[in-house]
Regions:
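Short beta-strand scaffold segments in enzyme catalytic cores
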Residues: 116, 121-128, 440-444, 504-506, ...
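Bacterial N-terminal signal peptides
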Residues: 12-24
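Extended C-terminal subregions enriched in glycine
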Residues: 384, 448, 496, 532, ...
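Short, small/polar residue-rich loop motifs at catalytic or cofactor-binding pockets
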Residues: 317, 436-439, 500-502
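Noncatalytic scaffold domains of N-terminal-nucleophile
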Residues: 33-85, 89, 97-98, 102-280, ...
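Bacterial N-terminal signal peptides that target proteins for export
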Residues: 2-15
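Active-site rim segments in enzyme catalytic domains, especially the processed small/beta chain
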Residues: 110-114, 121-138, 153, 159-160, ...
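Internal maturation/activation junctions in enzymes
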Residues: 54, 354-458, 470-471, 478, ...
């Protein structure tokens, strides 16, 4: 009898479900296309759900979008799920954090092509558990041998008197902004030195996706638009640029149109290049047919890069810039990276908060108080003024390391406190490193305790906008951050690295390597260092966990315009008061707030330390915890 009752109920529910669905379809005329339902802030005809309100969490801080992800055998976090899963697959197959990082970056080369490519720049901080050391790799590009100041001046490009910082006088896109690719060299370099696998294994996920295709997500579709990169007269260099590169349109658009969310995208030419790297290593990129095709494209557009420029390229290993902040040591990339501005910004906050507002701390003020935001904005403005004044290629600027050491000292920070008024914004106006940089960042960690903090970029959206035909990769535009001021440490010169907005960080608890360890990044042009400082404050001063630190509202300050973009909920709280202080504040969404990724290792003294044996299945002696940015398609995965 009970069986008959259950059967009857099941049939009734099934009938009700069919009736309800049919009734819904009938009441609305025809069923909606569920695959097309999305919101557009600029559209006046959004679906009704776009006017809904967000649901609440069950616990913790109600504004936190998700919990931290936790695992013990390994973890990868980045801005795109397929890329993160590719890195995790490498970890499961026995690879280490470095192997996983390269695999993840390579997939991002395909799925976020506007942000990253093998012909762009790459930096990494590698923590090796066996010796408890940090290793910094700079694989950023250098100017071609013909890229002289005289060459730029001869084609009509002169220093901009309204901008005495990075990018002054340089075009923003086109062939004159390209520098010799560094990323492909860096991928192999870090594998050879600290990885356990070769290109054959770690590039396989990227090559396969490029051949078979992947579905473009909403967030990535929003960013997927090519810049104007050439003139109608292809060899004309003056006044660039008036139209898109046809090779880029053929490679990155679908039937000549910008891809839409849900469309399947393939890049067989890029797959071919991945296969060449698998077979020949980086020599397959910097020498031979790939290099020749790159040089041919550059010369067809009037550029100067040569086969020798490519064949002779080398990155370099360097030492991080390290400072202490309230019990934690922050390691940042050295010049030409902007990383050290985060060190200086935190020093200023540490030295000046009590002097500007006696008896107060950042925690006692908190993000509901306009004085909290005022302090952060002023600290950023002071740090970036120093950054833009001195930053450049250390190989062309003897003594730069000593200058950075001085600027990141507490003594210097204390000298700057007098420049911060408690109720009036300072006027800025030096430098204009774009806040619109398009970059990928990722963190990776393995069961042996190795960790990687990684940043890889084309600089602007689709870099220079120029694609190498037949090989499917974009050329970056980092050279647009050179200056044409002959007196600047950042003036353009052959074989020189430009000022670089890329930043990756690593955090040590009290400077020790036996305490908590964190790989930290926040991409997005000049948002990177100011973003690092903001999330450090969120965690160290305000007590946020890794996920909450990302989900909290951020600001972006533009140094030359003096404008402050503040995310909308924070603007509602403090916007009017900041404007009254003289800040040029405007509300904004998360589009130019960068994208954060972080992994924290928290040791457990009850657990045995991990084995150094390659075939070990023992997890780390603690827990990996990860946070990822909801402003991107961020995901953290572990096992």
């Amino acid at each position: 009898m009970r069986k008959n009752i259950r059967t009857g109920i099941s049939r009734a529910l099934a009938a009700l479900a069919v009736f309800s669905i049919a009734g819904l379809a009938a009441s609305q005329g025809s069923a909606a296309d569920l695959a097309s339902q999305s919101c557009d802030a600029k559209s006046g005809s959004n679906p009704a759900f776009c006017h809904g309100v967000r649901g609440d969490r069950a616990e913790g801080w109600m504004a936190q979008g998700r919990s931290e992800v936790m695992a013990r055998n390994g973890m990868v976090t980045t801005s795109q799920p397929l890329a993160a899963e590719a890195g995790l697959e490498i970890l499961r197959k026995g690879g280490n954090a470095v192997d996983a990082a390269v695999a993840t970056a390579a997939v991002l080369n395909l799925v976020e092509p506007m942000n990253v490519g093998m012909a762009g720049d790459m930096f990494a901080i590698v923590y090796t558990a066996k010796d408890h050391k940090l290793h910094v790799l700079n694989a950023s590009g250098v100017a071609a041998s013909g890229q002289t100041l005289a060459f730029m001046n001869a084609h009509g490009y002169k220093v901009d008197p309204k901008n005495d910082g990075p990018g002054s006088g340089m075009p923003y896109a086109g062939i004159l902004t390209d520098t010799v690719p560094g990323a492909a060299w860096g991928w192999q370099e870090v594998l050879d030195k600290y990885g356990t696998m070769k290109f054959k294994q770690v590039l396989e996920p990227a090559a396969s996706y490029a051949e078979k295709g992947f579905a473009i997500s909403e967030r990535i579709a929003f960013d997927w638009h090519l810049p104007k990169a050439v003139n109608a007269n292809r060899s004309q260099l003056e006044n660039c640029c008036t139209e898109m590169d046809p090779d880029s349109v053929a490679t990155w658009y679908i039937d000549g149109k910008q891809p839409k969310a849900g469309q399947i995208f393939k890049n067989p030419d890029l797959a071919k290049t991945f296969r060449i790297l698998q077979a020949k290593g980086r020599d397959g990129f910097y020498k031979g047919p790939v290099a020749q095709a790159l040089v041919n494209k550059v010369h067809a557009l009037g550029g100067t890069m040569t086969m020798e420029d490519l064949a002779s390229y080398k990155g370099e290993w360097a030492e991080p810039v390290m400072t202490d902040y309230h019990g934690y040591t922050l390691a940042e990339l050295p010049p030409p990276s902007q990383g050290f501005a985060a060190n200086e910004m935190l020093n200023i906050l540490s030295a000046c908060t009590d002097k500007v507002y006696p008896g107060q701390t950042l925690a006692s003020l908190g993000p509901v108080d306009p004085r909290y935001w005022h302090l952060l904005i002023e600290a950023k403005a002071l740090a970036y003024a120093d950054l833009n004044r001195v930053n450049g290629d250390p190989n062309f600027n003897p003594g730069l390391a000593d200058k950075v050491k001085s600027l990141t000292s507490m003594a210097h920070a204390q000298e700057l406190c007098a420049k911060i008024s408690p109720d009036k914004a300072m006027v800025t106006g030096t430098g204009n490193a774009s806040g619109d940089g398009d970059t990928i960042v990722l963190s990776a960690a393995d069961r042996w305790g190795n960790m990687v903090s990684w940043v890889n970029s084309n600089y602007a959206n689709f870099g220079s906008g120029i694609t190498v035909p037949g090989y499917g990769f974009i050329l970056h535009n980092r050279g647009s951050l050179f200056t044409l001021d002959p007196n600047s440490p950042n003036v353009i010169a052959p074989h020189k690295r430009p000022y670089n907005t890329l930043a990756a960080a690593f955090v040590l608890q009290g400077g020790r390597t036996d305490g908590q360890l964190m790989a930290l990044q926040l991409m997005g042009g000049d948002m990177q260092s100011q973003g690092h400082a903001q999330v450090m404050v969120n965690m160290v001063d305000l007590g946020a966990n890794l996920q909450a630190a990302s989900d909290m509202a951020r600001f972006h300050h533009n140094q030359v315009r003096g404008t402050v973009d503040l995310e909308s909920e924070a603007f509602k709280l403090v916007g009017a008061q900041l404007i009254a202080m003289g800040h040029k504040v405007r509300p904004t969404d998360g589009g130019n707030m960068g994208g954060y990724q972080a992994i924290l290792m928290t040791p457990d003294p009850k657990e045995p330390k991990p084995s150094g044996a390659k075939n070990s299945t023992q997890p780390i002696n603690g827990t990996y915890r990860a946070g990822t940015d909801h402003r991107k398609d961020g995901i953290a995965v572990g096992w």
